[in-house]
C-alpha cells in the first residue's frame, strides 16, 4: 500500500508518497504564503492526478499548522517531533543528535539514552525566516546567500536571537561598506550560535549528527559552520527537508476519500472567535474627510529644471532607505528621491546627485547636509558641508510645519524616534531600545510573508470590519497571533488593520511608555515613511484621541530637516563643497577590511577609499586609526578602573596557582580576593579581560539563552582558566555585598550571587579540577575569618585559622584602599572637567560593565565627544540614603539611584544608564532612574548592550543627548 505524508509548516508545505519499500516516489515542496487550506487542496489534487493508485494510500498530516485541518478532515495527525524520530530511525539508524531548522522553528533531538527534545519557544531568531529576512536586507536572492558566504574573508559579530537585533548589526555594517560575503558568513555563524547556545542549553552535541530542514538542506556553507563549531562532520541525507513528511507517511494507517477531503479542506473555516477592535473608518465619506484634513500639511513643489536661484541639498541615509531633497530659498521642494538603500547607500546617493546635475547642470548649490545611520560615510564620500544628528534634523523639519510643536514621533524602517519639546527645545528623547516591532520593517515583513507589497497591504486594512486585536508584541509573537487569527477566520483585511494598530500601541506603550496619551501633548507632528500608511496614521489618532499633523513629505523629513539646517547654517551665502559633476564622473569606491592592531581592542576596520585622498574608516571604537594618536584615557573612569585592576600581578606562592574568572562581581571584588589568597601563599591570577574568543570557548555550556550576556561570558572565562592549566579555580557564591548604607539591604542580584552553582552544574570540566564555589559573606568582617577557614580547610587542610585571620584583615584593608582609590580618581576627573569646562557623563551600570567586550567601547566613543566619564560608584557616596518608589535592596541598584539623584544637582552632569539585555531586575531600575532624573528636568538616556558590537545606533543616541543639552 502507498503511504502519503504531508508536513504543513509555518512557511511551507512538504508532501511525499512512499511505496511499499518506503522509497519516495513523489515529492513536492511549496511555500503557502499563509494560504494553507487552499495550498493543501491544490497539492492533494495534483498528487491524485500524477500518482497512480494514490486514491487507496494511507494518509497522515504533521507540522505546526496541520492539526486544525487534520481534525476537521478526519485525517491522522502525527506530532512532528515523533515523525522526525520515526523517519530518522528508519532511514539513518544509529543517529545520536538531530538538528532541524525550519521556517520559524528550530529543534535539537537528542536520541541517545531516550528522547530529549529542545525547541525554540517564542523566538524565530536563527531559523529559515530569519535567514530569509537577512537575505532581503542584503538585497541578495536567498539561493545566492550560500555561494556568497563561501567567499568570505572575515566575520563580524551578529546577534541571531532576533531578526531585528541582527538588522541592527547588519545595517550599520552595510552603511560602513562591509563586504556582503563577510556579512553572509557572519549570518550563518549567528544561526549556529543561536542553535547551539539557545537550544542545546549546555548539553553537549556529540556522536552522529544529522542535519534536517530546508535551510540545512539547501545551504552547504551553513552546514560547514555547524561542523566547524561542533568539531564534527554531520550528515545531511538526501531529501532531508522531507523527513517530517516521510515520518508522517511511515505512521499513516488510515486511507481517505480524496474528493471528500479536498472539498472539506477547501471549505475549512475557523471559528470566527477572535478579539477585535472597532473599524478604522466607518465608510468612504469618513476616509475622505480624514484625507482632506491631512492634505493641508503640504510642501509646495517647484521645477528643478531651469531653476536659477540658490539651492540647498539635504540627504538622509537611513537604516533601510535613502532620501534626498533639493530646496529653494523658500523651503519649497525642487526635487526629491526616496529609495531603498539596498545595502549600498553610497551608490544610491551618487545616483541622486547625478540626477540633480543631469536635470539642472547649472544648479547653484549653496549648502548641503546629511543625516542618518550612513551620515559619516556619505559626508566623507561626497564632501557634504554638514553632518547633523537625526534628532535635530527631524525637529528642524517638524518646526517648519508646526512652530509650536509639543511632540514629534518618527516611525522609520527599524527605529522609532520621539521627542518631547518644551520651550522650543528638545526636552526628552525616546528611541526604541532593541526591538523594532513597532516599525516599518515589521509591517513590511508581514506584508511580504502574506504575499503582498506593503502599499497594497496597507490599503486592505482601511475598511476592515473587525481589525484583529494583536496587542503590542514582538514580530515573532505576532506571527503566532496572526496565524491563530487566520485559523479563527480573520480576513487579510482584519489582519492588516490589526497590525497597524499594534504598531501604534507598541510605539506608545513600549517605546514612549506613556501611561496615557495625554502625556504627549496636543500639538503633535508625525513623520517617517510608516505614517504614509493611512491605516497606521488613523490608528495613531484613534489611540491618542487627537488630530495630528502629517506632512505630505512624512517620509522625507530627515532629508528635508537636513536641507533646512544647511540653509540656516550657511545663511544663504557661499558655495557648497559638495561633489560636483566632474567629481562624480571620476568617483571610485574601494573597500578594504583589516584589523586595527593599535590597541588591545583590535577593532575590525572597514576602510572606504573614494579617490582624491578622501576616505572613511568604520568599525573603530576610538579615533586612533584616524588620527594615529593614542586616545587619552585621562578623563575616562572606565579605562582607569581597568588600569587599576591590571596592577594586581601574580606573586609566586608555596601553595600553588589559584585562578579566578574576571567576570561579574570579580571586577570589584578582585582586589579583596587577590590580597586574601596572596597572603595565604597562593599564586593568584585571573582570566584575561573578555574577548569574543573567550565567549565562544564557553558557548556550548550556556544553559539558557535568556540570561544576560555578562553571565554567559563566565562560561568562557572558566573554560579559559581550565585550558590554561588552572588546577584550582576560586569562584564563590555571595548572597551579600558590602553594606554602603544607601539602600534597605545590600544583596547581590541572584545571577551575580549564585552563578557559580550554574557553572558547577553545567560545565563538566570543572569536575576534573578543584572548583571552589562555597558561600562567602564579606559583609560580616567579624565572622568572615571563621567561615572562610571552615570553607577552605576542606580543600587545603594545612591552612590555619590564624593565617586566615591575618589574610582577611589585609584583604579588607586592600578593598578599602581600592575603593578610596576609585573615588579619588573619579573626583580628580570631575575637578579637571570642571576646570576645562567639559561636560561630565556618569556612565552608570554595574562593575562588570567596564569589561571592554561587554561595553563594546562605549566609554571610548563617549570620550571622543570631548566628554569626561565617571562611573556610578564615584558619585553615589555623595548622596545620603533617600526614599525610592521601589524596594531598594541591591547594592548595585542603590548606587544607580544615588548617582541619578546626585546628577540632578549638577548642571554640568548627565547620566547614561547601561543595561544588559536579559537583565530582569533592570526592568525596575530603568523606570526608577528615569523618574529620579525627569522629576528634576534631566534627560534620561538608556543604552541596551548585549552581544551586539556595532555602535552606530549608540552614537546617534549619545549625539542626540548632547545636542538636546546644547539646545537647552
Identify the meaning behind each predicted range.
Residues 5-45, 116-117, 121, 315-355, ...:
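Short glycine-rich, Thr/Ser-proximal phosphate-binding strand/loop in the N-terminal lobe
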Amino acid at each position: 500500500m502507498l503511504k502519503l505524508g504531508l508536513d504543513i509548516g509555518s512557511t511551507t508545505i512538504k508532501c511525499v508518497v512512499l511505496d511499499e519499500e518506503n522509497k519516495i516516489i513523489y515529492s513536492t515542496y511549496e511555500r503557502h504564503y499563509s494560504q494553507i487550506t487552499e495550498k493543501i487542496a491544490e497539492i492533494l489534487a495534483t498528487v491524485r492526478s500524477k500518482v497512480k493508485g494514490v486514491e487507496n494510500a494511507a494518509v497522515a498530516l504533521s507540522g505546526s499548522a496541520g492539526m486544525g485541518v487534520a481534525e476537521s478532515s478526519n485525517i491522522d495527525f502525527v506530532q512532528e517531533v515523533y515523525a522526525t524520530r520515526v523517519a530518522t530511525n528508519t532511514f539513518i539508524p544509529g543517529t545520536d543528535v538531530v538538528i532541524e531548522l525550519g521556517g520559524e522553528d528550530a529543534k535539537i533531538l537528542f536520541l541517545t539514552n531516550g528522547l530529549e527534545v529542545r525547541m525554540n519557544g517564542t523566538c524565530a531568531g536563527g531559523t529559515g525566516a530569519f535567514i530569509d529576512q537577512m537575505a532581503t536586507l542584503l538585497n541578495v536572492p536567498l539561493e545566492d546567500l550560500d555561494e556568497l558566504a563561501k567567499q568570505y574573508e572575515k566575520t563580524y559579530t551578529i546577534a541571531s536571537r532576533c531578526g531585528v537585533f541582527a538588522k541592527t548589526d547588519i545595517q550599520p555594517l552595510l552603511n560602513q561598506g562591509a563586504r556582503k560575503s563577510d556579512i553572509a558568513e557572519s549570518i550563518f555563524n549567528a544561526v549556529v550560535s543561536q542553535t547551539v547556545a539557545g537550544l542545546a542549553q549546555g548539553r553537549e552535541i556529540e556522536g552522529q549528527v544529522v542535519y534536517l530542514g530546508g535551510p540545512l538542506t539547501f545551504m552547504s556553507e551553513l552546514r560547514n559552520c555547524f561542523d566547524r563549531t561542533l568539531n564534527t562532520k554531520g550528515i545531511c541525507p538526501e531529501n532531508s527537508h522531507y523527513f517530517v513528511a516521510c515520518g508522517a507517511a511511515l505512521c499513516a494507517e488510515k486511507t481517505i476519500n480524496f474528493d471528500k477531503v479536498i472539498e472539506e479542506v477547501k471549505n475549512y473555516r475557523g471559528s470566527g472567535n477572535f478579539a477585535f477592535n472597532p473599524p478604522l473608518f466607518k465608510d468612504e465619506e469618513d476616509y475622505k474627510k480624514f484625507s482632506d484634513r491631512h492634505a493641508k500639511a503640504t510642501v509646495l513643489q517647484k521645477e528643478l529644471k531651469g531653476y536659477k536661484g540658490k539651492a540647498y541639498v539635504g540627504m538622509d541615509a537611513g537604516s533601510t532607505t535613502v532620501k534626498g531633497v533639493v530646496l529653494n530659498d523658500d523651503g519649497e521642494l525642487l526635487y526629491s528621491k526616496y529609495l531603498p538603500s539596498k545595502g549600498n547607500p553610497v551608490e544610491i546617493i551618487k545616483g541622486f546627485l547625478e540626477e540633480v546635475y543631469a536635470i539642472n547642470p547649472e544648479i547653484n548649490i549653496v549648502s548641503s547636509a546629511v543625516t542618518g545611520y550612513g551620515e559619516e560615510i556619505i559626508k566623507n564620500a561626497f564632501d557634504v558641508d554638514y553632518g547633523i544628528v537625526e534628532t535635530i534634523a527631524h525637529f528642524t523639519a517638524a518646526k517648519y510645519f508646526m512652530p509650536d510643536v509639543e511632540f514629534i514621533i518618527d516611525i522609520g524602517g527599524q527605529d522609532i524616534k520621539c521627542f518631547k519639546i518644551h520651550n522650543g527645545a528638545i526636552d526628552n528623547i525616546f528611541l526604541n531600545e532593541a526591538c523594532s516591532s513597532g516599525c516599518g520593517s515589521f509591517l513590511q515583513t508581514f506584508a511580504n510573508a502574506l504575499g503582498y507589497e506593503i502599499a497594497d497591504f496597507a490599503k486592505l486594512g482601511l475598511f476592515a470590519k473587525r481589525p484583529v486585536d494583536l496587542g503590542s508584541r514582538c514580530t515573532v509573537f505576532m506571527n503566532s497571533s496572526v496565524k491563530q487569527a487566520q485559523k479563527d477566520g480573520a480576513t487579510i483585511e482584519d489582519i492588516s488593520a490589526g497590525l497597524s494598530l499594534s504598531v501604534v500601541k507598541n510605539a506608545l506603550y513600549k517605546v514612549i511608555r506613556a501611561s496615557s496619551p495625554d502625556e504627549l501633548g496636543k500639538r503633535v507632528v508625525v513623520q517617517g515613511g510608516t505614517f504614509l500608511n493611512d491605516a497606521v496614521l488613523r490608528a495613531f489618532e484613534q489611540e491618542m484621541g487627537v488630530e495630528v499633523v502629517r506632512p505630505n513629505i512624512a517620509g522625507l523629513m530627515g532629508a528635508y530637516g537636513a536641507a533646512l539646517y544647511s540653509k540656516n547654517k550657511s545663511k544663504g551665502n557661499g558655495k557648497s563643497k559638495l561633489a560636483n559633476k566632474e567629481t562624480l564622473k571620476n568617483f571610485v569606491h574601494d573597500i578594504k577590511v583589516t584589523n586595527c592592531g593599535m590597541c588591545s581592542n583590535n577593532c575590525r576596520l572597514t576602510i572606504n577609499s573614494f579617490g582624491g585622498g578622501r576616505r572613511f574608516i568604520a568599525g573603530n571604537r576610538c579615533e586612533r586609526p584616524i588620527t594615529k594618536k593614542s586616545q587619552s584615557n585621562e578623563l575616562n573612569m572606565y579605562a582607569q578602573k581597568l588600569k587599576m585592576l591590571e596592577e594586581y600581578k601574580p606573586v609566586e606562592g608555596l601553595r600553588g596557582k589559584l585562578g579566578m574568572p574576571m567576570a561579574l562581581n570579580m571586577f570589584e571584588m578582585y582586589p579583596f580576593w587577590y590580597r586574601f589568597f596572596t597572603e595565604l601563599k597562593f599564586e593568584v591570577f585571573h582570566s584575561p579581560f573578555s574577548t569574543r574568543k573567550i565567549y565562544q570557548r564557553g558557548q556550548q555550556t550556556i544553559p539558557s539563552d535568556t540570561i544576560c550576556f555578562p553571565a554567559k561570558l563566565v562560561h568562557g572565562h572558566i573554560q579559559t582558566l581550565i585550558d590554561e592549566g588552572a588546577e584550582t579555580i576560586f569562584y564563590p557564591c555571595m548572597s551579600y555585598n558590602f553594606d554602603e548604607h544607601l539602600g534597605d539591604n545590600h544583596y547581590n542580584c541572584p545571577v551575580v550571587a549564585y552563578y557559580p552553582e550554574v557553572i558547577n552544574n553545567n560545565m563538566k570540566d570543572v569536575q576534573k579540577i578543584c572548583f571552589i564555589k562555597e558561600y562567602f559573606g564579606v559583609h560580616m568582617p567579624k565572622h568572615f575569618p571563621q567561615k572562610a577557614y571552615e570553607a577552605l580547610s576542606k580543600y587545603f587542610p594545612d591552612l590555619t585559622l590564624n593565617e586566615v585571620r591575618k589574610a582577611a584583615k589585609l584583604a579588607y584593608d586592600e578593598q578599602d584602599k581600592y575603593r578610596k582609590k576609585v573615588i579619588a580618581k573619579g573626583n580628580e576627573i570631575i575637578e579637571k572637567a570642571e576646570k576645562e569646562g567639559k561636560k561630565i557623563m556618569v556612565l552608570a551600570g554595574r562593575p562588570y560593565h567596564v569589561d571592554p567586550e561587554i561595553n563594546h567601547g562605549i566609554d571610548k566613543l563617549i570620550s571622543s565627544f570631548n566628554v569626561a566619564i565617571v562611573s556610578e560608584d564615584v558619585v553615589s557616596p555623595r548622596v545620603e540614603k533617600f526614599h525610592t518608589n521601589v524596594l531598594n535592596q541591591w547594592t548595585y541598584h542603590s548606587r544607580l539611584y544615588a548617582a541619578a539623584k546626585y546628577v540632578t544637582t549638577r548642571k554640568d552632569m548627565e547620566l547614561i544608564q547601561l543595561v544588559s539585555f536579559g537583565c530582569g531586575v533592570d526592568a525596575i531600575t530603568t523606570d526608577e532612574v528615569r523618574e529620579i532624573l525627569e522629576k528634576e528636568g534631566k534627560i534620561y538616556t538608556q543604552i541596551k548592550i548585549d552581544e551586539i558590537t556595532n555602535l552606530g545606533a549608540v552614537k546617534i543616541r549619545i549625539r542626540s543627548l548632547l545636542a538636546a543639552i546644547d539646545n537647552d
